[in-house]
């Protein structure tokens, strides 16, 4: 992690179990202080009331000791969610999403809308009063209605295809309250390149699981067998959007 000032690390000795945990706690404190400086700067320039500030993360807590015994600073937890970073279960990508915009957002609200970083570009286009780029097929949806207390209308479900995920079902989809996981019949790999891209794009899905996250946030009750009609519906939806995503994907080298 990013190194923190010594005085911040020192304040956690006696509280933390060891030096590495003190470093982790100091990192969190340092991040909080940095966000505070940003908000204070906006206020000093009289920009705080009409500036949208978004605080979020790119993934869940670091997987324990992923880099071996020397990486002793993996102290984040995501209970009661299942998994951690590098998983396609909820703990892999369900993260904090805090938005501050006093002129437009009533403080203290909690929204149940599902929002992704994929939604940033269409939202910012919406805020700027412009249209999404016509030459781009965007997977996200503007969440401006959610900021105004209205419901979002997401035309496409959110889809994750993670070739090197640590769990076995490396493709995930979120459609409303439903979560779908599926196996990808393609070997785990960290890189998609010209040598394996054809095989990757031809990979099929199997062994689908479905979960009602409104009742089962830790994804412990697979409803595939007890709700076959919903399984078929969600499986078909995932297949369509999975194929669209992999066919439109580029190889970056």
PLM regions and their residue ranges:
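Active-site regions of oxyanion-processing enzymes, predominantly non-cytosolic
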Residues: 1-11, 43-54, 90, 159, ...
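Loop/turn elements at helix/coil->beta-strand transitions in domains of secreted/extracellular proteins
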Residues: 47-53, 94, 154-156, 175-178, ...
